[in-house]
A protein has these predicted regions:
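N-terminal secretory signal peptides that target proteins for export/translocation
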Residues: 1-5
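Bacterial N-terminal signal peptides
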Residues: 10-21
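Low-complexity, acidic Ser/Thr/Pro/Gly-rich terminal tails and inter-domain linkers that flank the onset
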Residues: 24-40, 81-82
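Short beta-strand elements of extracellular/lumenal beta-sandwich folds
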Residues: 36-56
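A surface/secretory-pathway sequence property marking extracellular, secreted
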Residues: 56-60, 64-95, 99-101
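Exposed beta-strand and adjacent loop surfaces of beta-rich binding modules
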Residues: 56-62, 114-116, 129
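Low-complexity, intrinsically disordered segments enriched in Ser/Thr together with acidic residues
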Residues: 94-114, 121
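Extracellular/luminal low-complexity Ser/Thr/Pro-rich, glycosylation-prone repeat/linker regions
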Residues: 120-136
Length: 136
């Protein structure tokens, strides 16, 4: 009878282990969007944005630079730049799951730690606005 109890316990343990290790769908707002700097100092700034499914339809990407920074080039083209505040904004529409790189070429280099970013989006499941802070 003891072997039945230990066998049942082992079977239950294996069943629970399998259940926990199965891939699960994302909950609303959980890890839908991520951001990581590929380059955060010098003249070339690159922010990698990763979007999971279900993708929000629109992303607002905000890059904070030192005030007065001169931008030589941007890819994609930004929608707004307030040089006095050092705030660059992109509105990315028709977003699909995948990776997006936002790049800036600056006239003068910025020091490490001199920038930060935000990614804003509406969670498709809950309808809440999410603000993701990105730091180098």
């Amino acid at each position: 009878m003891t072997w039945l109890k230990s066998g049942a316990s082992s079977l239950l343990f294996v069943a629970l282990l399998l259940l926990v290790s199965l891939p699960r769908p994302l909950c609303a707002g959980e890890a839908l969007v991520g951001g990581q700097y590929l380059s955060a100092a010098g003249q070339d700034i690159q922010l990698l944005v990763t979007v999971s499914s279900p993708a929000p339809s629109t992303l607002i990407v905000i890059q904070n630079l030192p005030p007065g920074t001169v931008i030589d080039a941007a890819s994609p083209a930004f929608n707004q730049y307030d040089a006095g505040k050092g705030e660059v904004k992109w509105l990315l529409t028709h977003v699909n799951p995948g990776r997006y790189t936002v790049s800036l070429r600056l006239q003068r280099p910025v020091v490490s730690g001199g920038i930060s970013g935000d990614i804003r989006y509406k969670d498709p499941g809950s309808g809440r606005m999410i603000n993701l802070r990105v730091r180098p």
